[in-house]
């Protein structure tokens, strides 16, 4: 059924009353049983549902197809979604607080300016999402696959067994100043195409980056490594050395950085001479600190 028809069917005939019933139950967090809803591929057929601006609290939705549904500006608090499809759904400017998604897909969904806070996303596939100005706060992602991302901010989020498959442009992983270190564990970055990606205060535990020389990575103890690299760089008293020391200070000396946090930057984000000096001094600093037993 074409997308326009999926949407239109909720505004004609019996679809009007059916949409009202579905939205009322979603808002109250009650089950959708007994509404006579059809199924598609074994999932409750909610494709094209007009749920823009929905204010929903609690409840669990299991096994629903919400492809092409409209959740723009919705506020979903404590709602748990399991085995649901949100493929090509519009969740722009939606706010998802608490709750979470498990074994769901959001292929080519629109998540522009959406806010995710305090939930758990497990085994979620986000291939092809539109992510401009998406923000996530205190959210745990496990087994989740991320596509290329642009203008995304993750604050105090944890990532376990996740995979980032594409370019990261102005994507920020912010963990500084949290009571416990924020974690990237068993995470793979398949692409080194980073442009102003920022890792600030995130602990790296078995994190894989492409080994193609495009990135400068300090897998642990960046604060100590940056301090030692700054001392090593004093051999260079020229503008390149000064630029590097300034850059390292800006990234390592702000309050709240844990002693164990890792760090990474794209060489393209630095002037070529500064990038070359950064790579060599940070490498030498790590070697010295390992030899001294300061870092593992």
Regions found by a protein language model. Give the residues of each.
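N-terminal capping/linker segments that flank leucine-rich repeat
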Residues: 1-39, 222-296
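Tandem repeat scaffolds
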Residues: 4-12, 16-236
